[in-house]
Amino acid sequence: MRPGEESQLVPKEIENAADEPRVLCIVQDTTNCKSVNERITLNLPASTSVKQLYEDVSNKAGYVSSTFSLMWGNGASNTDMAALDPTPDRTLQEAGFEAGKKNFLHLTDKDGEQPQLTSDESGTADSSGLDDSSQEKFIGPLPREESVAGTSNYVSQNYSYSSLLSKSDTGYVGLVNQAMTCYLNSLLQTLFMTPEFRNALYKWEFEESEEDPVSSIPYQLQRLFVLLQTSKKRAIETTDVTRSFGWDSSEAWQQHDVQELCRVMFDALEQKWKQTEQADLINQLYQGKLKDYVKCLECGYESWRIDTFLDIPLVIRPYGSNTAFGSMEEALHAFIQPETLDGPNQYFCERCKRKCDARKGLKFLHFPYLLTLQLKRFDFDYTSMHRIKLNDRMTFPDELDMSPFIDMEDEKSPQTDSCTDSGAENEGSCHSDQMSNDFSTDDAVDEGICLETNSNIEKLNKSVAEKNSLYELFSVMVHSGSAAGGHYYACIKSFADGQWYSFNDQHVSRITQEDIKKTYGGATGNRGYYSSAFASSTNAYMLMYRLKNPARNAQFLEASEFPEHIKLLVQKEQEQEEQEKRQREIERNTCKLKLFCMHPVKQIMMESKLEVHKDKTMKEAVEIANKLMDLEGVIPLDCCRLVKYDEFHDYLERSYEDEEDRTMGYLLGGVKSSYMFDLLLETKRPDQVFQSYKPGEVMVKVYVVDLKTETVASPVSVRAYLSQTIIEFKQLISKSVDLPPDSMRVILERCYNDLRLLNVANKTLKAEGFFRSNKVFVESSDSLDHQLVFTDSHLWKLLDRHANTIKLYVSLPEHPRPTARSVGPKGGGDMNPQEDYCSRAKSVDAILEESTEKLKSLSLQQHQDGGNGDSSKSTEGSDFENIDSPLNEVDSSGSADNRELENRILPADPENNFQPEERSDSDVNNDRSTSSVDSDILSSSHSSDTLCNADGTPIPLANGLDSHSITSSRRSKANDGKKETWDTAEEDSGTDSEYDESGKSRGEAQYMYFKAEPHAGEGCLAEGSKCLLVNVDKRITLAAFKQQLESFVGVPSSQFKVFRVYASNQEFESVRLNETLSSFSDDNKITIRLGRALKKGEYRVKIFQLLVNEPEPCKFVLDAVFSKGMTVRQSKEELLPLLREQCGLDLSIDRFRLRKKTWKNPGTVFLDSHVYENESISSCWEVLLEALDETEKMKSMSQLSLFTKRWRPSELKLDPFKEVVLESNSVEELRDKICEISAIPLENLEFAKGRGTFPCDISVLEIHQDLDWNPKVSTLNAWPLYISDDGAVIFYRDKTEEVMELTDEQRNELVKKESSRLQKTGHRVTYSPRKEKALKIYLDGPTNKDSAQD
């Protein structure tokens, strides 16, 4: 062929390929086999066969082609889709696929089975075909978003920490990290990969009759190891193992040390294996022996003992050195390097009978079969006082020869030479860090060395295998992080194939020798000694070696070699795993959605969760729903059906007529994690016919309004189309409610209080703003009301009232009592309380009885005048009837005519408008008692610590810092002559006044709806209590609401208070009288308590008694009312009788003072001439009352009152408080005053300011050193004293007085006593950082955890 001809062939081929039509296939995966349903797009030639389409989809989706089906509907709707058959040899074009258009297909389950992933077909071995070099390697903590290469992407919904369910391609199974259990996972994987330990564990047989399997540690380890060896899962939970440790869920959030866990777990296993074949297993595998000796350098006498160890702790960096050991061998040599005891550390030689220089050290006598080495990377930095991690580089060999570290002379020499204890543990030591605590029993255990002293030490058995000291590295437990926290994982070499693997919680991957070298630690560049204080790094922390001895080295037991009890356990676990798999399969094919039903008898909407298999038919689903709603025997099954429902809009979307035999998966659009709709189990009477609901319809709730009776009937549901006109809609409504459409007025409520009259006949519902669910009011009367403008009509006012009326449950007080005196300014502004009011008023019982009778007899009355804004709310066709107030008859000017409670509240004087209040109810009550009462009724909120008797349930008082506390110096203000004034008339008032200065009642000139009737049962706060059911317009003010309640409470509105009750039965007082009830909602509960309401300028004040030398220095006494402009002396005069009557405190007016209370601290002393207007006060005002032993010393604002207390070190006790009054803020004057009251010479006096809140309690064991004694200042308002106001605490002492010396027993007793005292008072000022929780394994199970811990 010529070149020219050849060049023409390629364009010809391209041209033919372009001419062939192509089919665009979009495949949606609906199987729920993966966490995210994929969408696959394929653009194939039309000549592609259907079979090839299956293959292409299989490759794209990762499924085996024969395990799924493709649904296709030839371009029709989803409801007509059918399975695409791959067997006939047809092309896509022949099958009906259209070229140039989108062809949508659904990938679905085949025969009810989930598609099989291609990774599942190949098993758990290497199916990728990649060698180790091409595999993605991983070492270190895994990022959350990443996964290990070569693993399956099959999602497990059962294991929250396992992103994949199938086993890793390595063939090994990971462990799920519960929260912070990575240290546990690392050790468990290491033990599992130790053939000798795993095989021995398998040989142990659990006896269920002797022990509970839940608390058996060996059995749970055995189960875990069996699952790790046989399970096909990617990761296994460890919760059963930790539960056998006696741990609860909180233990999973505790970080611990892997070496500590190893020791504790081995101890627990030894305890559990007592009197079994495995009793000595830990010692046989992990225990070594060493000699601890001291040798006299003068006579050669040697004293020694034999110790056992389970692991060898090696320091990274010697104490006091800047250079770390470069290798593990160097650290081992340093471990056995002896130190010389000389100078003050000389050793007392038993032979020489005197102190001599000696050599002290350790010698290894026997190494264990499995050698454990701990690299002590955690240290304490005494400069920064922080725990640090040493990230220095330390190498370790793959094969370790331990023969240089064995003392061969000791092996050859007899062991009977001088076996006495050297007693060196009581001697001083200057050895390096790893030796500093070797002779302390507790510390030695922490280091992994178990001390064992025996006078008759057995001779060491030496075998040929033990002479061989060559060890092979097989596990590196790595810590990544800092001393503050981090992550553990393990690098383990498999003895089966010699390959290294990274076991990082649930992730297992292959690694190489180079990855092991990365765990040596170290960093590039120069690093200072303390540079690693908070550094995060990854390095080896614990190493495990196994002795290379072919005679002893074991191989893992294969499944065929398992003991019989293990085979049974494997079978049991496999059956359980299969059951879990079947259950997961069922879960994946179960449709779960909300189910609602209006109970046909109870007439309440019930809610449940419907779970139905996707292959169940609609008829079967109705049966399930019928049982779920407990309707069996209540209503026949043929009177029930399921319809598509939108609960949020209360909208029936569609019904499923003639589809009873369709599957639920088909009708619901497949199995989904969540649905955008719900189901409603609709019921009917046998004589009724179900209405058909079509998509596109809208639901309308029609309320019929009767203007004559002013009632709103219950709703009737009507379904309409958005395309209907208003005239058609009226005709549709007319058929349902039997009203003439010609005179019908239709009002649409589009949202709250948005009423729209639909009067354009040809306008469509869509144009009027109809949506899925709508609310419509209709009225058809012959009155002239429809001729008025809609907003002026009676219908609009009735609907407006209907929308704003709420139902409240009001609990009344038991017995109205005459109100106590008010504490007010002398000479003016007092309100006339009408003392004979209560005596003339009827009792609550009589009022309720009379009101009930009148409710039965009164006829409905209408108010048609222009100012009539009256409204009522009716439910189920009933109306709120108007009742008159019996108390009003008494109070009226002789009139006996019935008067409605729907009253026009008389307008107040124009100047008596309500003042704005900046604090809401929640703000007011956040820092005040939840149950504030009148001065003669004690607050129940202080019943736990009050000095007086009080009734009611205690409610905790939330104390907080006064937002108006004085932060600047009162003294400087007094000296500068400045005066504090009120910013605005009502700015700091705790409440709006219900009365003006002249005592006139303040009201609102608006007509509001109010109706009250006696109520018993649901809604009442206490059984047997008097309760009202009140229907009220929520636009009424609190003041008007209280006035309407006067007749029922039996006292004027100024003599009771309103408390709102929340879900937790916590009460908050509503005090803002000019606010409406708009924040209230239906069925809210209200409690009425007796107590005088505040007038303008008045403030409710909580009085506390200051008892400086009592354990509880601040006790609540009573509530009082102070007013602006009152002097302190006037308030004291008013308080005296109250204190005498209510609390039994008989005080003289000159023998007590009032002072400011700032949280728990006593503050400024109020002088008798002080006017409260000069003090910044708030609605949550608190004042301290302090009884005096003598007449008042404070005469001027320039004086300063301090509390002083003497510390006696020789007796370890504190004297009572004594008050010192200073004329200035001079330190010299303070020292002189203290000398006067203490008789301490001035040159020996030392003082310090107390810390914390009053009374500044501190332990007697700490006060002598912890306080800042004798500060070098000349004035009290300078640093570090900062004393500028009354109430500061000063401790003082005689510096020549010596501190009492205590024995250990006395000190321990005093520590307990002081700790108990300070805990009771709550005054603990010393700071103690949170201690690390000790790692413990509770052998008696979780029930005895507390006792075991103790």
UniProtKB/Swiss-Prot annotation:
Enzyme class: hydrolase
Catalytic residues identified in the record: C182, H487
Keywords of this entry: Cytoplasm, DNA damage, DNA repair, Hydrolase, Protease, Thiol protease, Ubl conjugation pathway
SUPFAM superfamilies cross-referenced by the UniProt entry: Cysteine proteinases, Ubiquitin-like
Catalyzed chemical reaction(s): Thiol-dependent hydrolysis of ester, thioester, amide, peptide and isopeptide bonds formed by the C-terminal Gly of ubiquitin (a 76-residue protein attached to proteins as an intracellular targeting signal)
Segments forming domain USP: 173-548
Compositionally biased tracts (Low complexity): 929-945
Entry's EC annotation: 3.4.19.12
Gene that encodes it: usp47
Organism: Xenopus laevis
Major localization class: cytoplasm
A biological-process GO annotation: DNA damage response
CDD domains per UniProt: peptidase_C19C
Gene Ontology CC terms: cytoplasm; cytosol; nucleus
Region of interest: Disordered: 111-138, 409-437, 815-836, 859-1000
Database matches in PROSITE patterns: USP_1, USP_2, USP_3
One term of GO molecular function: cysteine-type deubiquitinase activity
Protein name: Ubiquitin carboxyl-terminal hydrolase 47
PANTHER family: UBIQUITIN CARBOXYL-TERMINAL HYDROLASE, UBIQUITIN CARBOXYL-TERMINAL HYDROLASE 47
Similarity section: Belongs to the peptidase C19 family. USP47 subfamily.
